[in-house]
Amino acid sequence: MGYFSNVMRLGRGIVFLFLTLWAIGWMSGCKYFDPDANFIDDHKVWEKIKKEAPELGLDPNFVYAICHAESSLNGNAQSSIARGMMQLTEAAWSAVTNLHYRTAFQWETNVEVGMLYLKRLKGMLESVDMFNYPRLAASYRYGYNALRKEQYMVSRMKTPINRIYRKLFAGQLSPVEPPEN
C-alpha cells in the first residue's frame, strides 16, 4: 500500500506541476501581461474613428471592430510583418502615405493610415462593383488579391480564428459595441 500511495502522490505532483506551467504559459500570452503593450482608452479611439471614418466613406463601427480584431486597441501591437493598432504591413502603409513606417506605433497615425488603406481597398472593390463590408474585411485581413483569386467570394476564404473577423465575414457590421459617452 505504501508504494501505491507514493506513486499517487507523485502523479498528483506531476499533474500540479503541469497545470502550473500551463497557466504561467497562458498568462504570459495574455494581453495584460505584455510589458510592451500600450492599450489605448476605448473612448479616445472611438471618438477619433466616429469623427474621421465617415469623412472617408467608412462605417465607424466597422473600423472600430477592425481595431479590436487586429490589436485589442494596443498601440504597440507588433507581429512579424505588421505594426500598430490596425496591424498595417509596410506595403499597405506605403500604398497610402509617405509617412515613415516607424510612426506606425503612434496610435492616432496608425488609425488614420489604416482608414486610408480601408478607403483604398473599398475603392478597389467598388471599381469592380463588388463592394460590401464582408469583402472589405476579407481584403483587409487576407489581402485584396487573395479575395480576387477567390472570385470575391468571402465564403471561399479561410475562416478566421478571430471571433470578430468571423462576425465581420458573416456580415455583422458592428460586432464590437462602441463605448458609451
What are these regions (language model features)?
Residues A23-L73, E108-V111, Q172-E180:
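Export/targeting segments at the very N-terminus of extracytoplasmic proteins
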Residues F131-N181:
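Catalytic and substrate-binding regions of cell-wall glycan-acting enzymes that process beta-1,4-linked
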Residues E90-K149:
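Alpha-helical segment that forms one wall of the substrate-binding/catalytic cleft
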Residues E55-D59, S79, M130-N132:
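Extracellular/periplasmic catalytic domains that process cell-envelope and extracellular macromolecules
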Residues D34-F39, I49-A53, N74-A82, V96-E108, ...:
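Second-shell loop/turn segments in exported
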Residues F62-V63, G84, N132, L136:
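Residue-level detector of well-ordered alpha-helical segments, enriched
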Residues G2-F18:
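N-terminal Sec-pathway targeting helices
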Residues I49, I66-S94, Y117, G143:
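Cell-wall polysaccharide-cleaving catalytic domain and substrate-binding groove, primarily
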